[in-house]
Regions:
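Hinge/lid segment of periplasmic solute-binding proteins
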Residues: 1-29, 38, 51-53, 79, ...
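Short helix-initiation/N-cap motifs at beta->coil->alpha
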Residues: 47-53, 122-137
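Short, solvent-exposed loop/beta-turn-alpha elements that line the ligand-binding surface or hinge
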Residues: 1-4, 85-106, 156-157, 169-175, ...
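Glycine-centered hinge/linker elements that transmit conformational signals in sensory
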Residues: 55-57, 94-124, 167
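Extracytoplasmic/periplasmic substrate-recognition and gating elements
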Residues: 40, 115-118, 155-219, 223, ...
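C-terminal capping/gating helix-and-loop segments adjacent to ligand/active sites or protein-protein/ligand interfaces
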Residues: 240-276
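Paired acidic/hydrophobic, glycine-rich loop segments that form the ligand-binding mouth/hinge
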Residues: 142-147
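Periplasmic solute-binding protein
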Residues: 6-44, 69-92, 114, 176-185, ...
């Protein structure tokens, strides 16, 4: 188990027991149009929220926005965490975003929208994320906040050089890991359970984890993947991959394993829309 990336393995535990293995995992990142950055005299991705606002202002004009981000729970959570909060508290029986960590991301978005520097993609959930990526590829937005799993698709679709940076921070670097894990269900025969376990081990071994990361854009889930010659060659060909892998160490918050989580996500989506 020590070979799995800690920030990803932590999300595989429930009630102190390991119940799954990391597989298709991702982190939120900032994508930016390097051509537009060069035109605006900008060299690097914004590091802080103040940098984000300043860069978005410099990049806005001629029918194009500086920044775009879906108004959904996962991207809001990434900003909450970068402001020092969490969605649920440590015991998962209360909120962890009271006060500034919960309100500052909303004020950030509201200010940028009011300034005309932030594009709000239409739709909700995956539809909104797709609209955000389309705005980026079409030149309507110079920076977008999206999943690291979208890297290969954006690099293939965009007719400009795509850059990657960490999600800008307020007080700290911290991210919610996204994606999915692999697990087995109880209630099957011993033979079926043994076969299921062999399949999980096969899907998550180093060779297949590298192959999966290369073919899908999801993160390498093992340190041995990152250390492999095949993955090093991938990074050499596309340095954006290294920037994404560097963010995994900041995936400090696991998605809560509580029955109320799906309901909470829907409440967040609705209330964020009302606030903005």
């Amino acid at each position: 188990m020590s070979d799995f990336m800690p920030g990803l393995l932590d999300a595989s535990y429930y009630d102190g027991a390991l119940v799954a293995l990391p597989h298709s995992r991702s982190v939120p990142v900032l994508y930016y149009n390097k051509d537009r950055f060069k035109e605006a005299g900008l060299e690097e991705a914004p590091v802080t929220w103040d940098d984000l606002k300043a860069d978005a202002k410099a990049l806005t004009g001629n029918g194009s926005y500086g920044y775009s981000c879906p108004l959904d729970q996962w991207y809001y959570m990434s900003l909450v965490m970068n402001a020092g909060g969490t969605i649920f508290n440590e015991t998962e029986d209360g909120i962890g975003f009271a006060g500034d960590p919960g309100t500052k991301p909303l004020y950030l978005w509201k200010e940028m929208i009011a300034d005309g520097t932030m594009h709000v993609p239409s739709g909700q959930d995956y539809n909104s994320s797709e609209a955000c990526r389309n705005a980026f590829a079409g030149g309507t937005a110079a920076m977008i906040q999206q999943s690291s799993a979208q890297l290969k698709g954006l690099e293939k679709t965009c007719e400009f050089e795509v850059g990657v940076g960490a999600v800008p921070q307020d007080t700290t670097l911290s991210y919610p890991a996204g994606g999915s894990n692999l697990l087995m269900f109880k209630g099957h025969s011993e033979e079926e359970e043994k076969a299921g376990w062999e399949f999980l081990k096969y899907m998550t071994n180093t060779e297949n984890a590298v192959r999966w990361a290369n073919g899908t854009g999801y993160l390498p889930t093992r340190q041995s993947c990152i250390d492999s010659e095949e993955y090093k060659k991938m990074v050499e060909e596309d340095p954006n991959l290294q920037i994404i892998v560097d963010q995994v160490q900041y995936s400090t918050y696991k998605t809560p394993f509580i029955p109320q989580y799906q309901e909470a996500k829907e409440i967040f989506a609705n209330e964020i829309q009302k606030c903005i």
